[in-house]
A protein has these predicted regions:
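A ligand-binding cleft/hinge motif common to bilobed small-molecule-binding domains
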Residues: 1-25, 194-195, 199-205
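Periplasmic-binding protein-like
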Residues: 8-47, 73-76, 221-222
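Catalytic and substrate-binding regions of cell-wall glycan-acting enzymes that process beta-1,4-linked
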Residues: 22, 30-33, 43-44, 180-252
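Extended ligand-binding regions for polar small-molecule ligands
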Residues: 27-70, 88-89, 240-243, 249-256
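Export/targeting segments at the very N-terminus of extracytoplasmic proteins
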Residues: 69-118, 152-155, 169-170
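Substrate-binding/active-site groove segments that recognize
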Residues: 122-146, 151-164, 246
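Low-complexity, Gly/Ser/Thr/Pro-rich intrinsically disordered linker/tail segments
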Residues: 241-285
């Protein structure tokens, strides 16, 4: 039994599982805490939820989480799963190393590469970008990458560039918005991202939030709006789809990692340790 949000997010990692029937409609979600706890955890949880509702953090996180989960089919998930088994293992350690070096979740870097090239290190676009992370020649030179078709150089260059974009964001933009805007800038260019922020600010909207900027980026394809900003026309829908896709791929890869790790841990436990673990569960949970 799962709630609708959990099903929406996790259905891709288990594409063979479907909805049998609904038990209730739109009931609130509750958190259960063991009776023997001293109240510290439940107090902090209630405090966080209250504050997150007041400053709309909860709303923003929910929108980010659900913005991509319904846009992908079982076929999309199957293709991603297949390539995650056949292509990703070759590059996994490089993604992990780059993630540690630049303080970026390696699943996110791997998701970027899947979005850019489907983990094809020979990928070449008609626009001139190429390689696993689809670097432009200018970006490759800036990141000191000599061979864009070398997958390991490409991972280094793309990771370094994303880290740079994230570092030069306005200091009042915090996570996760900081990384999400850096992703959009990686796709459409920082200048167009800043133009979208200007449009949002003119309307009195919070230009530090990705949930705001994703609504204004598409306006850059309309002359009424792009003619009033510095960097002009942009296909503003593309960076929105780009970020949504990467978030989906990242979530899929993280769930896949968790599932794999969980299965490994379970298989290594003997019956006695399982018995002890079960006996330790408070009867109130």
């Amino acid at each position: 039994i799962v709630n609708s949000i959990e099903h929406s997010v996790n259905r891709h990692i288990h594409p063979g599982v479907g909805i049998a029937f609904s038990i209730v409609q739109n009931n609130p979600i509750s958190l259960a805490f063991p009776r023997h706890e001293d109240g510290t955890l439940s107090t902090l949880a209630n405090k966080f939820i209250k504050e997150a509702k007041q400053d709309e953090t909860l709303k923003d996180l929910t929108q980010i989480l659900t913005s991509y989960s319904d846009k992908f089919s079982v076929a999309d998930s199957k293709r991603l799963s297949d390539l995650a088994e056949t292509r990703l293992p070759t590059y996994k350690k490089s993604f992990e190393s780059a993630g540690e070096k630049y303080n970026i979740d390696w699943h996110l870097l791997a998701a970027m590469a899947y979005q850019e090239s489907h983990w094809d290190h020979k990928a070449i676009s008609p626009t001139g970008v190429r390689g696993l992370m689809m670097l432009t020649l200018t970006t490759a030179k800036e990141m000191e990458i000599s061979n864009r078709l070398d997958p390991f150089q490409s991972i280094e260059g793309g990771s370094k560039y994303l880290a740079k974009l994230r570092s030069i964001m306005d200091p009042d933009i915090i996570e996760p918005d900081r990384t999400l805007m850096a992703l959009a800038a990686y796709n459409v260019g920082r200048g167009h991202l800043e133009d979208a922020r200007i449009l949002a600010s003119r309307d009195g909207k919070d230009d530090r939030k990705w949930t705001t900027i994703r609504e204004y980026l598409p306006l850059l394809s309309r002359k009424k709006f792009y003619s009033t900003v510095t960097h002009g026309y942009a296909r503003g829908n593309e960076p929105v789809r780009y970020v949504d896709n990467i978030l989906y791929y990242q979530q899929f890869l993280k769930l896949q990692t968790m599932t794999s790790t969980g299965n490994d841990n379970f298989s290594n436990q003997d019956s006695n340790s399982n018995k002890k673990w079960q006996d330790s569960i408070p009867p109130t949970i």
